[in-house]
From Swiss-Prot:
Annotated organism of origin: Maridesulfovibrio salexigens (strain ATCC 14822 / DSM 2638 / NCIMB 8403 / VKM B-1763)
Lineage: Bacteria, Pseudomonadati, Thermodesulfobacteriota, Desulfovibrionia, Desulfovibrionales
Associated pathway: Amino-acid biosynthesis; L-leucine biosynthesis; L-leucine from 3-methyl-2-oxobutanoate: step 2/4
Entries under PANTHER family matching the protein: 3-ISOPROPYLMALATE DEHYDRATASE SMALL SUBUNIT 1, 3-ISOPROPYLMALATE DEHYDRATASE SMALL SUBUNIT 2-RELATED-RELATED
Protein name (record): 3-isopropylmalate dehydratase small subunit
Any one Gene Ontology molecular-function term assigned to this protein's record: 3-isopropylmalate dehydratase activity
Pfam families tied to this protein: Aconitase_C (PF00694)
Length: 164
């Protein structure tokens, strides 16, 4: 579970309406949602992002309404991991349930600048800032959550478990 990409910083208290505005909730198609990811924060934000880039957020990322569309839109934008100072609890569970890797790093998020090149190892709980040479640590993804991620989300995980 190692990912290399460019860091894209967003602020504090980014709610699910900023991640994917309500006017785009007419679908659950990841590509359609991804094309409008973060549209409530910055029009055209998606044009700056490449596959496997990494979102870095301040505190309370994903607050607001409980909707699966928010993590689906992030994944649809090609972003496999969000690193944040902290997450809203309901978003944290929804994110993993949809297959999005989420890592909490506390105040160390300040060491990850916009545009920095990062290498994230979610299994080890390490984030290397290739740009600065600094490595920060966080709690690794727990084994149960890794199982969900390996299957691509909770629904596929349950299907896999039931088939055995």
């Amino acid at each position: 579970m190692s990912i290399k990409g460019t860091a894209y910083r967003v602020g504090a208290h980014i709610d699910t309406d900023a991640i994917i505005p309500a006017r785009f909730l007419v679908t659950t198609d990841p590509d359609e949602l991804g094309a409008n990811c973060m549209e409530g924060l910055e029009a055209g934000w998606i044009k700056r992002v490449k596959k496997n880039d990494i979102m870095v957020a301040d505190e309370n990322f994903g607050c607001g309404s409980s909707r699966e569309h928010a993590p689906i839109s992030i994944l649809g934008a090609g972003i496999p991991v969000v690193v944040a100072k902290s997450f809203a609890r309901i978003f944290y569970r929804n994110g993993f349930n949809m297959g999005l890797i989420l890592l909490e790093v506390g105040d160390d998020f300040e060491k990850l600048g916009d545009g920095d090149q990062l290498e994230v190892d979610a299994e080890k709980g390490e984030i290397k800032n290739v740009t600065t040479g600094e490595t920060i640590t966080c709690a690794p993804v727990p084994p149960f959550m890794k199982g969900i991620l390996d299957c691509g989300g909770l629904v596929e995980y349950v299907k896999d478990r039931l088939s055995k």
